[in-house]
Design a protein with these regions (language model features):
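Short acidic/His/Gly/Ser-rich catalytic and metal-binding motifs that mark active-site loops
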Residues: 172-176
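Canonical Radical SAM [4Fe-4S] cluster-binding loop centered on the CxxxCxxC motif
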Residues: 1-20
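Conserved AdoMet/S-adenosylmethionine-binding subsite of the radical SAM
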Residues: 27, 31-42, 47-171
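Short microdomains enriched in Cys/His and/or Lys/Arg
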Residues: 16-32
Length: 176
């Protein structure tokens, strides 16, 4: 898990508050709110990591597109590598770049960078618009050298429409 996950309360799929819902039922609920989305709104699939529930995600994305709902995927790009079909139904990717080097990525997440790298390659190949997000964590991702390297890395990507540097915060830390 990422060192600075802001919602560990969502990890359990069996807790007392866990609810199972079909993609069909979800999109039916979402469709009721379509008038509130306006011209620029829609649905954002986030997590945790939405790519870890790829079958549900794909069905929900397809149903959203059939209902005329704009779709956004908020992800760190960690899944099984079968991204093309999911991205066919994704209007915008909010890409959380945890780190831009293999070593740094492993330090932040404890995971291999390859899945995220493959996801980014597919996003670029499919030319899906992308907003980059990066959490600036004191002592971890806030150094000048790191930020310069991140800038160079982001400049190597295409179809990036926006870059957001997000401040690290400790809101909710008392809960965990």
């Amino acid at each position: 898990r990422c060192q600075y996950c802001h919602n560990p309360d969502t990890w359990s799929l069996t807790g007392k508050d866990a609810q199972h819902i079909s993609a069909e039922a979800l999109v039916k609920k979402l469709s009721r709110f379509k008038p509130y989305y306006g011209d620029r709104g829609g649905v954002t699939f986030s997590g945790g990591e939405p790519l870890l529930e790829k079958d549900f995600l794909l069905e929900a994305l397809i149903r959203c597109k059939q209902a005329g709902i704009h779709t956004c995927l908020d992800t760190a790009g960690c899944g099984d590598g079968d991204y093309g079909e999911i991205l066919r139904y994704t209007d915008l990717v909010l890409m959380d770049i945890k780190h831009y080097t293999e070593e740094g990525y492993r330090k932040v997440t404890g995971m291999d960078f390859e899945a995220s790298r493959r996801f980014l390659e597919t996003v670029q190949q499919m030319n899906v618009p992308m907003w980059i997000r990066h959490v600036v964590v004191p002592g971890l991702t806030d150094g000048e050298t790191h930020l310069e390297g991140l800038k160079t890395y982001i400049q190597s990507l295409k179809n990036v429409e926006r870059v957001e540097l997000l401040p690290y915060h400790v809101l909710g830390v008392h809960k965990y």
